[in-house]
Design a protein with these regions (language model features):
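Alpha-helical transmembrane segments
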Residues: 62-266
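PRPP/pyrophosphate-binding module of the type I phosphoribosyltransferase fold
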Residues: 51, 60-63
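Membrane-interfacial loop-to-helix junctions in multi-pass inner-membrane proteins
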Residues: 1-7, 61
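Transmembrane alpha-helix boundary signature
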Residues: 1, 16-30, 79-85, 139-146
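Membrane-embedded alpha-helical core segments of multi-pass
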Residues: 7-22, 41-49, 67-73, 101
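Hydrophobic mid-bilayer segments of alpha-helices in multi-pass membrane transport proteins
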Residues: 5-10, 238-240
Length: 266
């Protein structure tokens, strides 16, 4: 665990070396951060994002699919800033997210259940690093005051987007760390209590479990991204429709599990 953290911190240091760091936060207006605070926050974001993606990599195709969906939501916002608002700095995260999406989509056919190739820690941590780099470049270095107030608002979107895009991995990471600390274990020890394990125990196959988590990722990430270029009421309707479908899909059980339940009752 210490070796992994050291490697992740080194990767964050390389980003800092090339000028990729959080410059300000959209809190109480636009708060310009002192360089030391921005650098510390950058390292923290990198460590959290890398481990969030690494922790979620517990089923065939799960991490690659979630990162592809998260990258798509990031790309929509980055493309808007680069093309519509003309922000030159948004070009780099647009390219990073496009490459990340392509890598994940190309890998998924080989990694979906039953997987023939596994990404392992090195793959999942690299995807986390790519997401962290695009997130910092996109939301930590672009002036939110330039975003139209007719949309979600200049103070909210850059703050909400990274959390929305990574909501599922971050939730799983937080719950896992708290659960293991309460049990007196290392936060990096393994267990079978991740979100995907619980969904499978509820009667879902690996493929259906991955699909459920894909849908929840999209349901949280895409409406926030859409709010950057659509009125809030449009985003709300879009979010409501996605939420209704995702809840309906999540409440179902796989056909094989229903057959097994019927046999047990008989």
């Amino acid at each position: 665990a210490i070796t992994k953290l050291a490697g992740q911190a080194l990767a964050a240091g390389i980003l800092l070396l090339y000028g990729i760091q959080v410059l300000w936060l959209p809190i109480n207006g636009v708060t310009m951060l002192p360089p030391s605070v921005g650098q510390l926050l950058t390292v923290l974001i990198v460590l959290v994002t890398i481990n969030a993606v690494n922790f979620i990599d517990g089923l065939d195709g799960l991490a690659a699919g979630i990162v592809a969906i998260s990258g798509a939501a990031f790309f929509a916002f980055a493309y808007l800033l680069a093309v519509v608002y003309g922000f030159n700095r948004a070009g780099a995260p647009s390219l990073i997210t496009a490459v990340t999406i392509g890598v994940c989509l190309g890998f998924l056919p080989h990694n979906s259940h039953p997987a023939r190739i596994f990404m392992g820690d090195s793959g999942s941590m690299f995807l986390g690093l790519m997401l962290a780099a695009s997130s910092i470049t996109l939301t930590g270095q672009v002036d939110p005051n330039a975003i139209s107030e007719e949309k979600l608002g200049p103070a909210l979107l850059p703050l909400l987007l990274p959390f929305a895009v990574l909501a599922i991995p971050l939730a799983d990471l937080t719950l896992a760390i708290l659960r293991r600390i309460r049990a007196g274990k290392s936060p990096f020890s393994s267990d079978k209590e991740h979100l995907h394990h619980r969904i499978m125990r509820a009667g879902n196959t690996q493929i259906r479990t991955a699909g459920i988590m894909y849908l929840w990722t999209a349901t949280i990430a895409f409406p926030v991204s859409v709010s950057a270029f659509a009125p809030l009421w449009v985003s709300a309707i879009f979010a409501g429709a996605m939420l209704a479908f995702t809840i309906h899909f999540s409440r179902g059980k796989s056909k094989s599990f229903r057959t097994l339940e019927s046999a047990n009752r008989g």
